[in-house]
Amino acid sequence: MSQGPPPGESSEPEAKVLHTKRLYRAVVEAVHRLDLILCNKAAYQEVFKPENVSLRNKLRELCVKLMFLHPVDYGRKAEELLWRKVYYEVIQLIKTNKKHIHSRSTLECAYRTHLVAGIGFYQHLLLYIQSHYQLELQCCIDWTHVTDPLMGFKKPVSASGKEMDWAQMACHRCLVYLGDLSRYQNELAGVDTELLAERFYYQALSVAPQIGMPFNQLGTLAGSKYYNVEAMYCYLRCIQSEVSFEGAYGNLKRLYDKAAKMYHQLKKSETRKLSPSKKRCKDIKRLLVNFMYLQSLLQPKSSSVDSELTSLCQSVLEDFNLCLFYLPSSPNLGLTNEDEEECESGYAFLPDLLIFQMAIICLMGVHSLKRAGSKHYSAAIAFTLALFSHLINHVNIRLQAELEEGENPVSAFQSDGTDEPESKEALEKEEPEPEPPTVVPQADEGRKSRKHSRLSCLRRRRRHHPPKAGDDSDLSEGFESDSSHDSAQASDGSDSGSDKSLEGRGTAFDAETDSEMNSQESRSDLEDMEDEEGTRSPAQEPPQARSEVPDSLNGPLGPSEASIASNLQAMSTQMFQTKRCFRLAPTFSNLLLQPTTEPNSVASHRPCVNGDMDKPLEPASEDGSESEGSESSNRSCRNERSLQEKLQALMAEGLLPAVKVFLDWLRTNPDLIIVCAQSSQSLWNRLSVLLNLLPASAELQDSGLALCSEVQGLLEGCELPDLPASLLLPEDMALRNLPPLRAAHRRFNFDADRPLLSALEESVVRICCIRSFGHFVARLQGSILQFNPEVGIFVSIAQSEQESLLQQAQAQFRMAEEEARRNRLMRDMAQLRLQLEVSQLEGSLQQPKAQSAMSPYLIPDTQALCYHLPLIRQLATSGRFIIIIPRTVIDGLDLLKKEQPGARDGIRYLEAEFKKGNRYIRCQKEVGKSFERHKLKRQDADAWTLYKILDSCRQLTLAQGAGEEDPSGMVTIITGLHLDSPSALSGPMQAALQAAAHASVDVKNVLDFYRQWKEIG
C-alpha cells in the first residue's frame, strides 16, 4: 500500500466500502432471481438451462470477490450464499424430484456435471485461500498450497488475525462442502465416492477439530450401516464436540426411535432354525439393535425401569461376547458361496473399527450421565467395565492363538504326562507359519486346516472306493439339525486336506474334542462375566444412584459420594455375577485343580491365581465368554514364541487400540478402579493376562529393533506408573477433543509436529502405555494387581489371599498348558448358540425332579447310534444331557459303516457335531491301561463293548481326592440292546451288567430311557 496524504488514506477505505456494498447488492439481486426460478413447479426442468447456469456462475464470481474483498464482515455470509444458492438448493431440488428424472436422461447428466463442477470449484478455492493467506495445512489435508521452492521464503501476508482465522475456517468449510458433494455423488448409480467423502470430512476435522459438523455429515454418510451403530457414534461425537451441530440431536433421536422399533420387532419375531451363516447374521443384528436400544435408555432424560435396564445390559453383554467369536473367514464355519449370499443382507462378523466405536459410545454415555447426575450412571459404568472385560478377554484369546500356533493340544483326560515329550518334539519339528498380513484370525485357518478328525479320515478313506448302491446314505440330507448344512461343509472341508493317516494316535480328533470335554460347567460360582445367559432371569433391581453427581470423578471418593460408590459396587456385581449350577464329573474338576506335570503340588493349598481362590479354574463358561484359563499368565507358556512373532501378532491385533483408549480413561478415573476392584475381579484377571503377554521394556530394548529415538525414549519409562512422555497414536488423534478423554489427553500436544511412526513403532508405543498402566494399577490401594519383579509378571490377587507372589507365579507356570487348551476351545465355539444352550441348561438341570431322576451324562453304545440316531439327537439337542462318545463306540461305527447305513449316518452326525463344537456331545479318549479281554471280544462282542464303555464311565466318575460326591446316578449307558429279559442275555453280558451296577452306572435301553425322559418332561 503506497504512502499518501491523509485525504488519500481516508478515501481508499471509503472506496473499498462502497465497492463492497455494490458487490453485496449485486449478490442479493442474483439470489433473488435464483429464488424466483426455484419457486416454479417445474423448476427441476428449468434449473439447468443455460441462462440459469450462467446466473449461478455470476453469483459464484460475485461471492468470491466479496469474501476476499472484506473477509471479516462478509466472508462467512458470502460462503453461505455461494454454497446454498449455487450448489445445495439445486441438489435438493433434483433429489426431491428424482422420481421425474430418468436414468441417463439429460437432466441426470446435467446433475452429475453440476456435482463434478462443484468439486472442482471448491478444490480450486481451497488452494487459492491457502496461497493467498500462506496457510500451512500440510499436516491436515491433501490439497495443500506448496510454497515455491525457488523463492526460499514465504510471501509476506498483510492480513489481520481475524482475517487469518476466517481463512482457516473457510478451508474447513470448503472440505465439508467437498465431502457433501462427494456424498451426493455416491448416491448416484455407478459412482462410489463414499471413501472420498469420508476423507474430506476427516480432513475438515483435522483443520478445525473443535467443530462437530463433519461428524454429523459422517453420520449421514454412514446411513443404516451396522444397524445405525456407526451413525450413532458419529452423531454422539458431533453432540459432544466443543461446537456441536443442532441437527445432530434430531438425527440421533430418529436413530433411537428406529432402534426401539427394531428391538421390539426382534423380540416378537419367532425363533426358527437357521443355517450357520444366517445364525451369525442374526446374532450380530440382535447385538447391534439391542446395543442401540440400550444406549437410548442410558440417556440423561430416560425414564427406563432399572430391572429392564439391567436385563438388557446383561443380554447385550452376552451377545457382545458371542459375536466377538465370529471372525472373518472363520475355518469352523466353512461358508460356501450360498452361505455368503444368505448373509449378504446382514453381517457375518464385527470389524475392529466398529468394536472400537462401540467402546467409545459407552465412554461418551458414561460422561453424559455423570454430567447430568442421572440415576443410570452406575449402570452405565458397570456395563462399560463388563464390556471392557470381554474385550480384553478376546484380545487375550486372539493373541494366545497366534503365540501358541502349532502347539499340540494336551489331552484333557491325560494325567500322567506321558505324551508330553511327543508333543514337544512335534512342536520342534513344525515350521512356523508366516504371519498374516492383515487380520489375526486368518492365522487360525492355517492351523485348523491341518487338524482332521478321526471320523474324517475314516470317511476320506472310504471315498477312494467306487460308490456302492447303499452309499447314497452318505449324503447329508434328511437331518433335522440346524447344523446339517454345516455338517456337509465341514465334511467337504476335511476331505480336501492331507490324506496322511492318523491311525497311530488319532490326535487331531481326540485332542480337540477331549479338550472340549474340559469345558464342562463348574459347581462353583465365580465372580466373572462368563455366565451372562444365566442372568437373563429377572435380576434384582439395583439401588438407585443419587440424583446429583459431582463434576469430577478424579480423586478419592468423599463421604458425600458413598451412595454412588455402593450403588456402583452393586451394579458392577450384577454385571459380573454368575449363576451356575451343574454337577461336574469329578474327573474334570480334579484335572483342573491338579496340573498334569505336578499332580500333588497344589492339591491342598492352591494359591489364589488371578483372583480365583478356592475354586476350580474354569475352562469355558456356558455362554462362551469365559476363558478363565486366559486369566493366568501366558508368559508361563513352555513354548515361547520369539519376540518378532509376538510383535507381529500385536501389530495384527486390531482391538488393541480400543484397549489402550479404555486404559487411558481408567487412568484418569482411579476411584472407579478402587470402587469396582472386587466386583469386577475378572476384568483385572484378564488384564493381568494381557500384561504378561506383552514383552517387557528390557526385552524390547535388548532386541535391537530399529526404533526411532522418540520410541526408544518412551521405552525407558515403560515400566513406570506414569509415563514421562507419550507419543500420539492414530486412536488418540481420532479421539481428539473427546470430553471423556480430555484429562487423559492433557499430556499430548496435538498441534506440535509428531514423528511419523511405523506400524511396529505404534505397537511398541501401545505396549508401553498398557504396561505402564499395569504398574499404575499395582500402585493403587486394594491390591488389585501386583507386579513380581523376580519373575517379571503381573498377578491379580484377592485381598484375603496371603500366599506369596512367587508361589502364585509358580502356579501360573504350572497351569499354562491348561490355559492354552481352554483358549483354543473358546475360539472353536463361535458358531454355537451359546446363550440358548445355557438357558436350556439352567432351566432343566437345575430342576430337582430332572436332576434326581435322570443322569446328566449319557453314553450311547454302537447299537444305539446305529438304530436310534434320531432319539440320540433329540437327547443331545434338549440341553438336559451331555452325550459322551467313547473311543470304543467310534471304532464300532467304523467296523459297521460298510454294511450299516445307520453307522454311516452316525459317523456323519458325530463328525458334524465335533467339528461344530457342540458342548452337549463330547468324545472321550481312552487313558491309561484297561484290562483287555481279547478272548471275550471274540466270543461276545456286545459284552466286550459294554465292558469297554464301563471303563470309560470309571474314567468319567473317578474321584481323585477325598470329599468328592458320590458318583452314583451321574452316568447312564443307553444301549440299543433289549434288557427286558436279562436271563435271555448271554453270560458275559449278564456279568457286564452286574459290573455296571456294582460301579453305580445305570444301563438302560435307549427307547425306555427316552420314554422315561418324555414322561418326566
Swiss-Prot record:
GO terms for cellular component: cytoplasm; cytoplasmic ribonucleoprotein granule; nucleus. Residues 406-562, 597-640 are annotated as: Disordered. The keyword Ribonucleoprotein does not apply. Residues 873-996 form the PINc domain. SUPFAM superfamilies: TPR-like (SSF48452). Keywords: Acetylation, Coiled coil, Cytoplasm, Nonsense-mediated mRNA decay, Nucleus, Phosphoprotein. It is found in: Cytoplasm; Nucleus. Plays a role in nonsense-mediated mRNA decay. Does not have RNase activity by itself. Promotes dephosphorylation of UPF1. Together with SMG7 is thought to provide a link to the mRNA degradation machinery involving exonucleolytic pathways, and to serve as an adapter for UPF1 to protein phosphatase 2A (PP2A), thereby triggering UPF1 dephosphorylation. Necessary for TERT activity. This is Nonsense-mediated mRNA decay factor SMG5. It comes from Mus musculus. The lineage of its organism: Eukaryota, Metazoa, Chordata, Craniata, Vertebrata. The gene is Smg5.
